[in-house]
Swiss-Prot record:
<feature type="modified residue" description="Phosphoserine">
    <location>
        <position position="320"/>
    </location>
</feature>
<dbReference type="Pfam" id="PF10358">
    <property type="entry name" value="NT-C2"/>
</dbReference>
<feature type="modified residue" description="Phosphoserine">
    <location>
        <position position="276"/>
    </location>
</feature>
<feature type="modified residue" description="Phosphoserine">
    <location>
        <position position="288"/>
    </location>
</feature>
<dbReference type="InterPro" id="IPR039931">
    <property type="entry name" value="EEIG1/2-like"/>
</dbReference>
<protein>
    <recommendedName>
        <fullName>EEIG family member 2</fullName>
    </recommendedName>
</protein>
<dbReference type="InterPro" id="IPR019448">
    <property type="entry name" value="NT-C2"/>
</dbReference>
<feature type="modified residue" description="Phosphoserine">
    <location>
        <position position="321"/>
    </location>
</feature>
<feature type="domain" description="C2 NT-type">
    <location>
        <begin position="1"/>
        <end position="142"/>
    </location>
</feature>
<feature type="modified residue" description="Phosphoserine">
    <location>
        <position position="228"/>
    </location>
</feature>
<feature type="modified residue" description="Phosphoserine">
    <location>
        <position position="350"/>
    </location>
</feature>
<keyword id="KW-0597">Phosphoprotein</keyword>
<comment type="similarity">
    <text>Belongs to the EEIG family.</text>
</comment>
Length: 360
């Protein structure tokens, strides 16, 4: 049995954020644990969910031991687990939302590296795992050991090209294509160019086997990046017409532009037919919506009709007798006044109070 090489690294781990959290509110925290090469454990601060995102921005530094085969020089896996948890009962208990396992051997000697990873579930049989994305920054520095070593193939889901955005972005959607706007002819040529767009993808979600092998064969990350970038630039897609294209058959953006410009223009009659068909579909759709609204209105009671019936049933004419039955002002001896009806003098006595009459 061959003796393995021993290495010691200083790891600077920064816990950035957790996005796409399926909670409107709540308090989340993380527990970090080094499963191989040490006994480091730590907990992050407890932060509140804001706009479906939790930001920690907390840095941790620790020492990590690694080993490598003396024959190949490839570092053995060193797993670092980040467990995301949610507070329950005011912090007295917690629930495990998911975890992310990071192989620190992939980041050895690569400088500052940003990694986004989907959370894995603890109980995938009974619960559905949410698509939360954990963002971390890892930097490793060799403290002791042979500086000549090889990193294992990366599990990142994109080819690390310098100047490109990081992998596993939130706004990234599957099957993104580079669209070239060439006028109205693109509207009628969409049905004919579906296989072309399926074969032409502007971004590779998974790294190819050759790019992974280039990482293994080189000691520096710069060499692997340059080799994978040159491989991507010189790759050509020979079977564009087939719809069963995988990640390996990727067409360059420049090839796609040249291919679309070189396509013959369709006849003007075809353009007019497609335009007239699209215009003729709109009134039909609008009529169907109006008929549906009419059916809904027929089942409802019209409030205006009810108000009109109530107003018609009321009698708003003036009653002449109501004018004569109001209060009257009476003046008594000594200038005393009182209010009452026209029967007041009869109760008080004749001549005691006289009614005040105002002539109009």
């Amino acid at each position: 049995m061959m003796k393995k090489k021993k290495f010691k690294f200083k790891v600077d781990f920064e816990l950035e954020e957790l996005s796409s959290v399926p909670f409107v509110n709540g308090v989340l925290f993380c527990k970090m644990r080094l499963l191989d090469g040490g006994s480091f454990t730590a907990e992050s601060s407890r932060e509140v969910v804001q706009a479906n995102c939790v930001r920690w921005r907390k840095k941790f530094s620790f020492m990590c031991k690694m080993s490598a085969s003396a024959a190949t020089g490839i570092l053995d896996p060193c797993i670092y687990r980040v467990s995301v948890r949610k507070e329950l009962k005011g912090g007295k208990a917690y629930a495990k939302l998911g975890f992310a396992d990071l192989n620190l051997a992939e980041f050895a000697g690569s400088g500052n590296t940003t990694r986004r990873c989907l959370l894995e579930g603890y109980d995938t049989k009974n619960t559905r795992q949410d698509n939360s994305i954990l963002k971390v920054l890892i930097s490793m520095q060799l403290m002791s050991g042979d500086p000549c070593f090889k990193t294992p193939p990366s599990t990142s889901m994109s080819i690390p090209i310098a100047g490109e955005s990081e992998s596993l972005q939130e706004d990234r959607k599957g099957g993104e294509t580079l669209k070239v706007h060439l006028g109205i002819a693109d509207l009628s040529a969409k049905s004919a160019s579906v296989p072309d767009e399926l074969g032409a993808c502007g971004h590779s979600r998974t790294s190819s086997y050759a790019s992974q092998q280039s990482k293994v064969s080189g000691y520096s990350t710069c060499h692997s990046r340059s080799s994978s970038f040159s491989e991507l630039c010189h790759r050509r897609n020979t079977s564009v017409g087939s719809t069963s294209t995988g990640v390996e058959s990727i067409l360059e953006p420049c090839d796609e532009i040249e291919q679309k410009i070189a396509e013959p223009n369709l006849d003007t009659a075809d353009k007019e037919d497609t335009a007239s068909e699209k215009l003729s579909r709109c009134p039909v759709k609008q009529d169907s919506v109006e008929s549906q609204l009419k059916r809904v209105d027929d089942t409802r009671v019209d409030a205006d009709d009810i108000v009109e019936k109530i107003l018609q049933s009321q009698d708003f004419s003036l009653d002449s007798s109501a004018e004569e039955e109001g209060l009257r002002l009476f003046v008594g001896p000594g200038g005393s006044t009182t209010f009452g009806s026209h029967h007041l003098p009869n109760r008080v006595g004749s001549g005691a109070y006289e009614q005040v009459v105002i002539k109009r």
